Protein backbone atom coordinates (compact mmCIF):
# COMPACT_ATOMS: atom_id res chain seq x y z
CA UNK A 1 0.00 0.00 0.00
CA UNK A 2 2.96 2.35 -0.35
CA UNK A 3 2.83 3.12 -4.07
CA UNK A 4 4.76 0.38 -5.91
CA UNK A 5 2.30 0.42 -8.82
CA UNK A 6 2.40 4.23 -9.11
CA UNK A 7 6.22 4.16 -8.89
CA UNK A 8 6.38 1.86 -11.92
CA UNK A 9 3.85 3.91 -13.91
CA UNK A 10 5.86 7.07 -13.16
CA UNK A 11 9.02 5.30 -14.33
CA UNK A 12 7.38 4.18 -17.59
CA UNK A 13 6.23 7.75 -18.28
CA UNK A 14 9.67 9.10 -17.38
CA UNK A 15 11.60 6.90 -19.82
CA UNK A 16 9.21 7.75 -22.63
CA UNK A 17 10.49 11.36 -22.73
CA UNK A 18 14.29 10.89 -23.12
CA UNK A 19 13.91 7.66 -25.12
CA UNK A 20 11.02 8.29 -27.55
CA UNK A 21 12.52 5.99 -30.19
CA UNK A 22 12.51 2.73 -28.23
CA UNK A 23 11.29 0.15 -30.70
CA UNK A 24 9.51 -2.39 -28.52
CA UNK A 25 7.23 -2.89 -25.53
CA UNK A 26 7.46 -3.31 -21.76
CA UNK A 27 6.10 -6.53 -20.26
CA UNK A 28 4.44 -6.54 -16.83
CA UNK A 29 3.66 -9.94 -15.29
CA UNK A 30 1.26 -10.07 -12.35
CA UNK A 31 -1.19 -12.38 -10.55
CA UNK A 32 -4.56 -12.75 -12.28
CA UNK A 33 -6.27 -11.15 -9.28
CA UNK A 34 -4.62 -7.76 -9.94
CA UNK A 35 -4.57 -7.75 -13.75
CA UNK A 36 -7.57 -5.42 -14.02
CA UNK A 37 -6.15 -3.25 -11.24
CA UNK A 38 -2.96 -2.63 -13.26
CA UNK A 39 -5.03 -1.78 -16.36
CA UNK A 40 -7.20 0.64 -14.40
CA UNK A 41 -4.25 2.39 -12.71
CA UNK A 42 -2.41 2.79 -16.03
CA UNK A 43 -5.52 4.26 -17.67
CA UNK A 44 -6.00 6.62 -14.74
CA UNK A 45 -2.44 7.89 -14.27
CA UNK A 46 -0.93 7.34 -17.73
CA UNK A 47 -3.72 7.55 -20.31
CA UNK A 48 -1.17 8.34 -23.04
CA UNK A 49 0.60 5.00 -22.53
CA UNK A 50 -0.69 2.35 -24.92
CA UNK A 51 -1.74 -0.51 -22.61
CA UNK A 52 -2.98 -3.96 -23.66
CA UNK A 53 -3.80 -7.18 -21.81
CA UNK A 54 -2.32 -10.44 -23.11
CA UNK A 55 -4.55 -12.99 -21.41
CA UNK A 56 -7.57 -15.14 -22.21
CA UNK A 57 -8.64 -17.19 -25.21
CA UNK A 58 -8.50 -14.30 -27.70
CA UNK A 59 -4.82 -13.42 -27.10
CA UNK A 60 -2.27 -13.61 -29.92
CA UNK A 61 -0.58 -16.99 -30.32
CA UNK A 62 1.51 -16.92 -33.51
CA UNK A 63 5.00 -15.40 -34.03
CA UNK A 64 3.67 -13.70 -37.20
CA UNK A 65 1.32 -11.63 -35.01
CA UNK A 66 4.15 -10.23 -32.85
CA UNK A 67 5.25 -7.49 -35.25
CA UNK A 68 2.01 -5.53 -34.94
CA UNK A 69 1.67 -6.39 -31.26
CA UNK A 70 5.06 -5.20 -29.94
CA UNK A 71 4.59 -1.47 -30.48
CA UNK A 72 7.06 1.15 -29.16
CA UNK A 73 6.42 2.07 -25.52
CA UNK A 74 3.38 -0.21 -25.37
CA UNK A 75 2.73 -1.76 -21.94
CA UNK A 76 1.74 -5.41 -22.15
CA UNK A 77 0.01 -6.82 -19.06
CA UNK A 78 -0.06 -10.57 -18.58
CA UNK A 79 -0.22 -13.23 -15.87
CA UNK A 80 2.19 -15.85 -14.57
CA UNK A 81 0.08 -18.69 -15.96
CA UNK A 82 -0.16 -17.11 -19.41
CA UNK A 83 3.61 -16.54 -19.61
CA UNK A 84 4.21 -20.15 -18.60
CA UNK A 85 2.00 -21.29 -21.50
CA UNK A 86 3.28 -18.72 -24.03
CA UNK A 87 7.01 -18.71 -23.26
CA UNK A 88 7.90 -20.10 -26.71
CA UNK A 89 6.16 -17.08 -28.26
CA UNK A 90 7.94 -14.46 -26.13
CA UNK A 91 11.37 -16.00 -25.45
CA UNK A 92 12.91 -14.64 -28.71
CA UNK A 93 11.70 -11.09 -27.92
CA UNK A 94 13.90 -8.50 -26.19
CA UNK A 95 11.51 -6.20 -24.34
CA UNK A 96 12.27 -2.67 -23.16
CA UNK A 97 11.90 -4.13 -19.70
CA UNK A 98 10.40 -7.09 -17.87
CA UNK A 99 8.60 -6.16 -14.64
CA UNK A 100 7.33 -8.86 -12.30
CA UNK A 101 4.68 -7.85 -9.76
CA UNK A 102 4.50 -10.00 -6.60
CA UNK A 103 7.90 -11.37 -7.57
CA UNK A 104 7.75 -13.91 -4.73
CA UNK A 105 5.65 -15.96 -7.18
CA UNK A 106 8.91 -17.04 -8.83
CA UNK A 107 10.57 -18.10 -5.56
CA UNK A 108 10.67 -21.81 -6.49
CA UNK A 109 13.57 -22.26 -8.92
CA UNK A 110 12.34 -25.67 -10.10
CA UNK A 111 8.78 -24.61 -11.01
CA UNK A 112 7.74 -24.25 -14.67
CA UNK A 113 6.45 -20.77 -13.90
CA UNK A 114 9.83 -19.60 -12.59
CA UNK A 115 11.73 -21.28 -15.43
CA UNK A 116 9.53 -19.50 -17.99
CA UNK A 117 10.00 -16.05 -16.43
CA UNK A 118 13.78 -16.61 -16.24
CA UNK A 119 13.86 -17.06 -20.04
CA UNK A 120 12.37 -13.63 -20.76
CA UNK A 121 14.77 -10.99 -22.11
CA UNK A 122 14.66 -7.27 -21.38
CA UNK A 123 16.95 -4.24 -21.30
CA UNK A 124 16.15 -4.15 -17.58
CA UNK A 125 14.33 -6.34 -15.07
CA UNK A 126 12.37 -5.29 -12.00
CA UNK A 127 10.56 -7.16 -9.25
CA UNK A 128 7.86 -5.77 -6.95
CA UNK A 129 7.01 -7.35 -3.62
CA UNK A 130 5.85 -6.68 -0.10
CA UNK A 131 7.09 -10.12 1.00
CA UNK A 132 10.24 -11.12 -0.93
CA UNK A 133 11.05 -13.80 1.66
CA UNK A 134 7.96 -15.83 2.52
CA UNK A 135 9.52 -18.98 3.93
CA UNK A 136 13.22 -19.56 3.26
CA UNK A 137 16.22 -17.34 2.54
CA UNK A 138 16.91 -19.37 -0.62
CA UNK A 139 13.84 -17.68 -2.16
CA UNK A 140 15.84 -14.44 -2.17
CA UNK A 141 18.57 -16.15 -4.21
CA UNK A 142 15.99 -17.22 -6.82
CA UNK A 143 14.55 -13.71 -7.11
CA UNK A 144 18.03 -12.22 -7.54
CA UNK A 145 18.90 -14.87 -10.12
CA UNK A 146 16.10 -13.31 -12.19
CA UNK A 147 17.02 -9.69 -11.41
CA UNK A 148 20.84 -9.84 -11.38
CA UNK A 149 22.08 -13.31 -12.36
CA UNK A 150 25.30 -14.25 -10.55
CA UNK A 151 25.18 -11.48 -7.92
CA UNK A 152 24.62 -13.96 -5.08
CA UNK A 153 26.76 -16.74 -6.54
CA UNK A 154 25.57 -20.28 -7.16
CA UNK A 155 22.89 -21.96 -5.06
CA UNK A 156 25.56 -23.95 -3.23
CA UNK A 157 27.70 -20.86 -2.54
CA UNK A 158 24.70 -18.88 -1.26
CA UNK A 159 23.64 -21.71 1.02
CA UNK A 160 27.11 -22.05 2.53
CA UNK A 161 27.79 -18.33 2.88
CA UNK A 162 24.37 -17.10 4.03
CA UNK A 163 21.57 -19.65 4.46
CA UNK A 164 23.24 -21.93 7.02
CA UNK A 165 24.82 -19.15 9.16
CA UNK A 166 21.62 -17.05 9.16
CA UNK A 167 18.82 -19.63 9.37
CA UNK A 168 20.56 -22.01 11.76
CA UNK A 169 22.72 -19.73 13.86
CA UNK A 170 21.24 -16.22 13.39
CA UNK A 171 24.77 -15.00 12.63
CA UNK A 172 24.74 -11.18 12.74
CA UNK A 173 27.83 -10.72 10.54
CA UNK A 174 26.30 -12.84 7.78
CA UNK A 175 23.09 -10.82 7.97
CA UNK A 176 25.02 -7.54 7.63
CA UNK A 177 27.14 -8.91 4.75
CA UNK A 178 24.03 -10.02 2.84
CA UNK A 179 22.38 -6.64 3.38
CA UNK A 180 25.48 -4.87 2.01
CA UNK A 181 25.31 -6.94 -1.18
CA UNK A 182 21.58 -6.63 -1.91
CA UNK A 183 20.68 -3.18 -0.55
CA UNK A 184 21.98 -1.20 -3.58
CA UNK A 185 19.39 -3.05 -5.69
CA UNK A 186 16.42 -2.56 -3.36
CA UNK A 187 14.17 0.49 -3.29
CA UNK A 188 12.24 -0.08 -0.09
CA UNK A 189 9.47 1.92 1.52
CA UNK A 190 8.15 1.34 5.00
CA UNK A 191 5.14 2.81 6.75
CA UNK A 192 7.51 4.17 9.40
CA UNK A 193 9.29 6.43 6.87
CA UNK A 194 8.80 10.08 7.86
CA UNK A 195 7.53 11.19 4.47
CA UNK A 196 4.92 8.40 4.46
CA UNK A 197 3.73 8.18 8.05
CA UNK A 198 2.26 11.69 7.87
CA UNK A 199 -0.05 10.50 5.05
CA UNK A 200 -1.38 7.49 6.96
CA UNK A 201 -4.01 7.42 9.70
CA UNK A 202 -3.69 5.44 12.91
CA UNK A 203 -3.73 1.63 12.85
CA UNK A 204 -4.87 -0.35 15.91
CA UNK A 205 -4.07 -4.07 16.11
CA UNK A 206 -6.17 -6.08 18.55
CA UNK A 207 -5.83 -9.78 19.35
CA UNK A 208 -9.10 -11.46 20.29
CA UNK A 209 -8.60 -14.52 22.48
CA UNK A 210 -11.38 -17.07 21.96
CA UNK A 211 -12.18 -20.38 23.69
CA UNK A 212 -13.09 -23.62 21.94
CA UNK A 213 -16.63 -24.91 22.36
CA UNK A 214 -17.06 -28.36 23.95
CA UNK A 215 -17.63 -29.90 20.52
CA UNK A 216 -14.47 -28.27 19.17
CA UNK A 217 -12.43 -29.42 22.18
CA UNK A 218 -13.49 -33.03 21.58
CA UNK A 219 -12.55 -32.89 17.89
CA UNK A 220 -9.29 -31.11 18.66
CA UNK A 221 -8.21 -33.66 21.26
CA UNK A 222 -9.05 -36.59 18.96
CA UNK A 223 -6.88 -35.08 16.21
CA UNK A 224 -3.99 -34.37 18.60
CA UNK A 225 -4.14 -37.98 19.88
CA UNK A 226 -3.82 -39.20 16.29
CA UNK A 227 -0.65 -37.23 15.67
CA UNK A 228 0.86 -38.15 19.03
CA UNK A 229 0.36 -41.84 18.23
CA UNK A 230 2.00 -41.25 14.88
CA UNK A 231 4.97 -39.38 16.36
CA UNK A 232 5.53 -42.09 18.97
CA UNK A 233 5.40 -44.86 16.36
CA UNK A 234 8.97 -46.14 16.00
CA UNK A 235 8.16 -47.95 12.74
CA UNK A 236 7.52 -44.73 10.80
CA UNK A 237 10.53 -42.71 9.63
CA UNK A 238 11.07 -39.04 10.47
CA UNK A 239 10.26 -37.79 6.97
CA UNK A 240 6.80 -39.39 7.03
CA UNK A 241 6.17 -38.02 10.51
CA UNK A 242 7.09 -34.50 9.48
CA UNK A 243 4.99 -34.81 6.33
CA UNK A 244 1.95 -35.44 8.49
CA UNK A 245 2.63 -32.42 10.71
CA UNK A 246 1.46 -29.76 8.25
CA UNK A 247 -1.56 -31.90 7.38
CA UNK A 248 -2.58 -32.01 11.03
CA UNK A 249 -1.88 -28.31 11.37
CA UNK A 250 -4.53 -27.58 8.72
CA UNK A 251 -7.00 -29.88 10.50
CA UNK A 252 -6.49 -28.11 13.81
CA UNK A 253 -6.90 -24.70 12.19
CA UNK A 254 -10.20 -25.82 10.67
CA UNK A 255 -11.47 -27.14 14.01
CA UNK A 256 -10.66 -23.78 15.61
CA UNK A 257 -12.81 -22.06 12.95
CA UNK A 258 -16.00 -24.15 13.34
CA UNK A 259 -16.76 -27.88 13.80
CA UNK A 260 -18.39 -28.06 10.36
CA UNK A 261 -15.09 -27.07 8.73
CA UNK A 262 -13.59 -30.36 9.89
CA UNK A 263 -16.44 -32.49 8.51
CA UNK A 264 -17.60 -33.38 5.01
CA UNK A 265 -20.94 -31.66 5.64
CA UNK A 266 -21.95 -28.66 3.56
CA UNK A 267 -22.75 -25.34 5.21
CA UNK A 268 -26.52 -25.53 5.95
CA UNK A 269 -29.04 -23.16 4.37
CA UNK A 270 -29.81 -21.44 7.74
CA UNK A 271 -33.44 -20.69 6.93
CA UNK A 272 -34.56 -19.18 10.24
CA UNK A 273 -33.10 -17.25 13.23
CA UNK A 274 -33.07 -20.36 15.43
CA UNK A 275 -30.92 -22.28 12.93
CA UNK A 276 -28.54 -19.34 12.54
CA UNK A 277 -28.13 -18.95 16.31
CA UNK A 278 -27.60 -22.68 16.88
CA UNK A 279 -25.03 -22.88 14.08
CA UNK A 280 -23.19 -19.72 15.19
CA UNK A 281 -22.99 -20.81 18.84
CA UNK A 282 -21.00 -23.92 17.87
CA UNK A 283 -17.96 -21.66 17.43
CA UNK A 284 -17.09 -18.81 19.79
CA UNK A 285 -14.93 -17.38 17.02
CA UNK A 286 -17.86 -17.13 14.61
CA UNK A 287 -20.11 -15.80 17.38
CA UNK A 288 -17.60 -13.04 18.23
CA UNK A 289 -17.20 -12.12 14.55
CA UNK A 290 -20.98 -11.70 14.20
CA UNK A 291 -21.00 -9.40 17.25
CA UNK A 292 -18.16 -7.24 15.90
CA UNK A 293 -19.76 -6.98 12.45
CA UNK A 294 -22.81 -5.55 14.23
CA UNK A 295 -20.61 -2.67 15.44
CA UNK A 296 -19.25 -2.10 11.91
CA UNK A 297 -22.75 -1.94 10.41
CA UNK A 298 -24.07 0.30 13.19
CA UNK A 299 -21.31 2.83 12.41
CA UNK A 300 -22.11 2.51 8.67
CA UNK A 301 -18.52 1.44 7.99
CA UNK A 302 -17.06 -1.38 5.87
CA UNK A 303 -14.99 -4.44 6.79
CA UNK A 304 -12.63 -7.00 5.23
CA UNK A 305 -12.58 -10.58 6.54
CA UNK A 306 -9.61 -12.79 5.57
CA UNK A 307 -9.55 -16.59 5.76
CA UNK A 308 -7.33 -19.21 4.11
CA UNK A 309 -10.14 -21.77 3.71
CA UNK A 310 -12.74 -21.43 0.95
CA UNK A 311 -15.33 -23.37 2.96
CA UNK A 312 -14.83 -20.98 5.90
CA UNK A 313 -15.36 -17.98 3.60
CA UNK A 314 -18.57 -19.51 2.27
CA UNK A 315 -19.74 -20.14 5.84
CA UNK A 316 -19.01 -16.56 6.97
CA UNK A 317 -20.75 -15.11 3.89
CA UNK A 318 -23.89 -17.20 4.46
CA UNK A 319 -24.10 -16.54 8.21
CA UNK A 320 -23.67 -12.76 7.88
CA UNK A 321 -26.10 -12.48 4.95
CA UNK A 322 -28.81 -14.37 6.85
CA UNK A 323 -28.08 -12.73 10.20
CA UNK A 324 -28.11 -9.13 8.99
CA UNK A 325 -29.96 -9.35 5.66
CA UNK A 326 -27.07 -7.69 3.80
CA UNK A 327 -25.09 -8.38 0.63
CA UNK A 328 -21.73 -9.95 1.54
CA UNK A 329 -19.12 -10.12 -1.23
CA UNK A 330 -16.69 -13.06 -1.48
CA UNK A 331 -13.36 -12.80 -3.36
CA UNK A 332 -11.55 -16.12 -3.86
CA UNK A 333 -9.44 -17.95 -6.43
CA UNK A 334 -12.47 -19.39 -8.24
CA UNK A 335 -14.04 -16.00 -9.00
CA UNK A 336 -13.81 -15.21 -12.76
CA UNK A 337 -11.82 -12.17 -13.82
CA UNK A 338 -14.76 -9.97 -14.88
CA UNK A 339 -16.52 -10.58 -11.56
CA UNK A 340 -13.38 -9.69 -9.56
CA UNK A 341 -13.53 -6.17 -10.97
CA UNK A 342 -17.20 -5.90 -10.01
CA UNK A 343 -16.48 -7.07 -6.43
CA UNK A 344 -13.73 -4.47 -5.89
CA UNK A 345 -15.79 -1.66 -7.48
CA UNK A 346 -18.86 -2.59 -5.42
CA UNK A 347 -16.90 -2.61 -2.16
CA UNK A 348 -15.11 0.66 -2.97
CA UNK A 349 -18.38 2.36 -3.93
CA UNK A 350 -19.58 5.19 -1.69
CA UNK A 351 -23.28 4.65 -2.43
CA UNK A 352 -25.43 3.87 0.61
CA UNK A 353 -26.64 0.52 -0.76
CA UNK A 354 -23.15 -0.80 -1.65
CA UNK A 355 -21.96 -4.01 0.03
CA UNK A 356 -20.44 -3.30 3.46
CA UNK A 357 -18.63 -6.62 3.99
CA UNK A 358 -16.01 -8.33 1.81
CA UNK A 359 -14.76 -11.82 2.63
CA UNK A 360 -11.44 -12.69 0.94
CA UNK A 361 -9.33 -15.79 0.63
CA UNK A 362 -5.87 -14.85 1.85
CA UNK A 363 -4.18 -16.31 -1.23
CA UNK A 364 -6.34 -14.63 -3.90
CA UNK A 365 -7.14 -11.35 -2.14
CA UNK A 366 -4.18 -10.79 0.15
CA UNK A 367 -2.03 -8.83 -2.31
CA UNK A 368 -2.37 -6.11 -4.93
CA UNK A 369 -5.93 -4.93 -4.27
CA UNK A 370 -6.86 -1.40 -3.20
CA UNK A 371 -9.70 -1.67 -0.65
CA UNK A 372 -9.43 1.57 1.29
CA UNK A 373 -13.18 1.78 1.95
CA UNK A 374 -12.58 -0.90 4.57
CA UNK A 375 -11.78 0.52 8.00
CA UNK A 376 -11.94 -2.78 9.91
CA UNK A 377 -9.88 -5.86 9.02
CA UNK A 378 -10.52 -9.31 10.51
CA UNK A 379 -8.02 -12.19 10.31
CA UNK A 380 -10.47 -14.99 11.06
CA UNK A 381 -7.80 -17.68 10.97
CA UNK A 382 -4.10 -17.00 11.36
CA UNK A 383 -1.52 -17.51 8.64
CA UNK A 384 1.76 -18.36 10.33
CA UNK A 385 3.59 -15.81 8.26
CA UNK A 386 3.48 -12.28 9.70
CA UNK A 387 4.54 -10.72 6.40
CA UNK A 388 1.63 -12.30 4.50
CA UNK A 389 -0.83 -11.19 7.19
CA UNK A 390 0.57 -7.66 7.03
CA UNK A 391 0.20 -7.65 3.24
CA UNK A 392 -3.47 -8.59 3.61
CA UNK A 393 -4.04 -5.83 6.19
CA UNK A 394 -2.46 -3.38 3.74
CA UNK A 395 -5.38 -3.83 1.33
CA UNK A 396 -7.10 -1.29 3.63
CA UNK A 397 -4.18 0.35 5.45
CA UNK A 398 -2.42 2.04 2.56
CA UNK A 399 -1.90 5.41 0.92
CA UNK A 400 -5.40 6.69 0.18
CA UNK A 401 -6.82 5.55 3.51
CA UNK A 402 -8.11 8.55 5.45
CA UNK A 403 -9.75 6.82 8.44
CA UNK A 404 -8.18 4.93 11.37
CA UNK A 405 -8.02 1.18 10.70
CA UNK A 406 -8.81 -1.47 13.32
CA UNK A 407 -7.22 -4.89 12.74
CA UNK A 408 -8.61 -7.86 14.68
CA UNK A 409 -6.68 -11.15 14.87
CA UNK A 410 -8.56 -14.13 16.30
CA UNK A 411 -6.49 -16.45 18.50
CA UNK A 412 -8.07 -19.58 20.01
CA UNK A 413 -6.60 -20.00 23.51
CA UNK A 414 -4.79 -23.14 24.66
CA UNK A 415 -4.53 -24.39 21.09
CA UNK A 416 -1.85 -24.37 18.44
CA UNK A 417 -3.08 -20.90 17.41
CA UNK A 418 -2.00 -19.32 20.69
CA UNK A 419 1.28 -21.23 20.92
CA UNK A 420 2.41 -20.41 17.41
CA UNK A 421 1.30 -16.80 17.87
CA UNK A 422 3.84 -16.60 20.70
CA UNK A 423 6.54 -18.25 18.58
CA UNK A 424 5.91 -15.80 15.74
CA UNK A 425 6.59 -12.82 17.96
CA UNK A 426 10.05 -14.27 18.67
CA UNK A 427 10.69 -15.23 15.04
CA UNK A 428 9.67 -11.93 13.46
CA UNK A 429 12.69 -10.01 14.77
CA UNK A 430 15.25 -11.99 12.76
CA UNK A 431 13.19 -11.90 9.56
CA UNK A 432 12.83 -8.12 9.78
CA UNK A 433 16.61 -7.67 9.93
CA UNK A 434 17.01 -8.75 6.31
CA UNK A 435 13.72 -8.09 4.51
CA UNK A 436 10.23 -8.71 5.96
CA UNK A 437 9.57 -12.43 5.87
CA UNK A 438 9.13 -15.52 7.97
CA UNK A 439 6.85 -18.33 6.90
CA UNK A 440 4.78 -21.37 7.64
CA UNK A 441 6.92 -24.32 6.55
CA UNK A 442 9.34 -23.73 9.46
CA UNK A 443 6.81 -25.46 11.72
CA UNK A 444 7.61 -28.85 10.21
CA UNK A 445 11.32 -28.27 10.97
CA UNK A 446 10.78 -28.06 14.75
CA UNK A 447 12.07 -30.84 17.01
CA UNK A 448 9.73 -33.69 17.91
CA UNK A 449 9.51 -32.53 21.54
CA UNK A 450 8.69 -28.96 20.45
CA UNK A 451 5.98 -30.25 18.13
CA UNK A 452 4.42 -32.28 20.94
CA UNK A 453 4.31 -29.16 23.10
CA UNK A 454 2.66 -27.20 20.29
CA UNK A 455 -0.06 -29.74 19.62
CA UNK A 456 -0.97 -30.49 23.25
CA UNK A 457 -4.36 -29.07 24.31
What are these regions (language model features)?
Residues 5-21, 116-121, 146:
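Walker A/P-loop NTP-binding motif
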Residues 13-111, 159-168, 274, 325-353, ...:
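SF2 helicase/translocase NTPase motor core
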Residues 71-72, 97, 105, 114-196, ...:
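Conserved P-loop NTPase motor "coupling/switch" region that bridges the ATPase
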Residues 77-82, 88-91, 151-261, 407, ...:
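Inter-lobe coupling linker of SF2 helicases/translocases
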Residues 93-96, 142, 369-382, 405-410:
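A short beta-strand element within the Helicase C-terminal
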Residues 136, 314, 358-375, 385-387, ...:
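SF2 helicase motor core recognition
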Residues 195-216, 221, 236-369, 442-457:
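Conserved Helicase C-terminal RecA-like lobe
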Residues 384-393, 397-457:
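A conserved SF2-helicase RecA2
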